[in-house]
Amino acid sequence: MTTTTKPSESNRKTDVESAVTRRPRRLRRTESIRALVRETVVRPEDLIYPLFVVPNSRGKVEIASMPGVWQMRAREIVEEAARAFDAGIRAVLLFGLPEFKDAIGSSSWDPAGPVQSAIEAIKRSVPQMTVMADVCLCEYTDHGHCGVIVEKSGKKDVDNDQTLELLVRQALSFAQAGADFVAPSDMMDGRVAAIRRGLDERRLSDVGIMAYSAKFASGFYGPFREAAESAPQFGDRRTYQMDPANGREALREIELDVEEGADIIMVKPALAYLDVIRSARDKFALPVAAYNVSGEYSMVKAAAQCGWIDGTRVMNEILTSIKRAGADLIITYHAMEFAKTYRA
């Protein structure tokens, strides 16, 4: 008579273990191991810090819809830039709020304007900081659009080619004040070529262009328009900013900017367009920037204030996802907060 031996509990466990041939959890076992094999690491040096500059006649004001973000005068901007540099951030992006507005945004090329003053002051006090200046007319026009308004067939619209001349004047003014990069965000056709030509003709060939190459007509810009006081007074910006549905068109826009002389290409917004960031990274050799925009920032802050999410953890996850998608540089209002937690 043959006796069948019932497998012991320990034998059964061994059988199960032998069936598991791959154990990815080994690489997640401790924080030091996780850090050792981490594929994507965001550093403060990867970030560009957006700052809003107001005239000296105004005071420092926190933006209600963007907790932790302020409108500041040039002297306060310099102090913030110095703190940012000490925290490891190597670039700031300046947006200006002028003393007065008109139909063509003429205050944007005033040599004594808020952005020009801030550029000069930063370069005196924090000379190693890379200073970028946003080039657009919406903050400076009384109608809030990004160019010269004309009437066509009874409808108001932005005239592309008239606007180019004004964008060049604005970019030149920022470059002459000492900006390292100008950053056209208007989405006019041909603006990169026009600005590059204007800079080169005035022997400002060292000044780079970070182009908002694929800028979508997004609902995520709301808080920014409060911060920059740039909401359009009529209509919207869909005749010049891109349709959110169009990924292939984004690559055509980026390719044009590359051909026209852009030094850095950008996708804006970031989170809803991670696929575009990845496509841009795969297709083009230039540095890719992505703008983690105001609405993305404010959603995190609002949810964190309600206790619904861990704001710091979500911030880190968002920035990591943007870099993982292919961005070399991330423009983000989280920059200082991230830099502080990174150093800690």
Language model features: what each stretch is:
Residues T2-R38:
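N-terminal amphipathic/basic leader segments beginning at the initiator methionine
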Residues S18, T30, R43-I48, V54-A344:
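Alpha/beta enzyme core
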